């Protein structure tokens, strides 16, 4: 059995892994794990990833979890352009720096924006208070400013003149609040231009394919009560 990727494109790290593999012509079998149906919580999936999270990778008898680890594994196993994860010590360190920063900052803010603005009221039927939503969106705005000031600055991409894993991970995160109807790029011309560069670099068709699900988040039907009961503890733990 060749490379298998366990993904749901509703998930932002899954989108990053999917885009990277497709863009670099890495052959893989796609194994869909439907988060909305709670398939990631099943005993069957726990055999692949006991943490019950996506993405997950299976390469023969070898399994791997965590999106950054998976992306790095793919850069090392397959012949991909150097700019994704440069050999140059300091250029690579810049990518590492962003990947270390984003997990508890941009990811948290973008995830909370999606769930508080759309997924709780629409999918789970549990509206959040206006105060909570306002605080979530304010936190997102602060994080976006940090992204611009610390990482993008006046560069073409987050870590230099070429796209890297940092940009791919960042853009897939930012499309979460976009899917919730947040005007993430409005009033931020540098960030908006950067998005256009990233989209062009990965290919517009692939970019749209990967984000088709999240851009329809507002149209999700209400969750079945049984699914809601199963998912709620997982959701609350995820966005806390």
Curated annotation (Swiss-Prot):
Function per UniProt: Conjugation of reduced glutathione to a wide number of exogenous and endogenous hydrophobic electrophiles. Acts on 1,2-epoxy-3-(4-nitrophenoxy)propane, phenethylisothiocyanate 4-nitrobenzyl chloride and 4-nitrophenethyl bromide. Displays glutathione peroxidase activity with cumene hydroperoxide.
- Presence of the UniProt keyword Cell inner membrane in the record: no
User: Its domain of life?
Assistant: Eukaryota
Among the GO molecular function terms of this UniProt record, one is:
glutathione peroxidase activity
GO CC terms: cytoplasm; cytosol; extracellular exosome
Q: Does the keyword Chloroplast apply?
A: no
Q: Where is the GST N-terminal domain?
A: 2-82
**Could you identify this protein by its name?**
Glutathione S-transferase theta-1
Q: Which GO terms describe its biological process?
A: glutathione metabolic process
Annotated localization: Cytoplasm
Any Pfam family from its record, for instance, is GST_N_3
Residue ranges of the GST C-terminal domain?
Answer: 88-220
- From the UniProt record, list the reaction(s) this protein catalyses: RX + glutathione = an S-substituted glutathione + a halide anion + H(+)
- What's the subunit arrangement here? Homodimer.
Tissue-level expression:
Found in erythrocyte. Expressed at low levels in liver. In lung, expressed at low levels in club cells and ciliated cells at the alveolar/bronchiolar junction. Absent from epithelial cells of larger bronchioles.
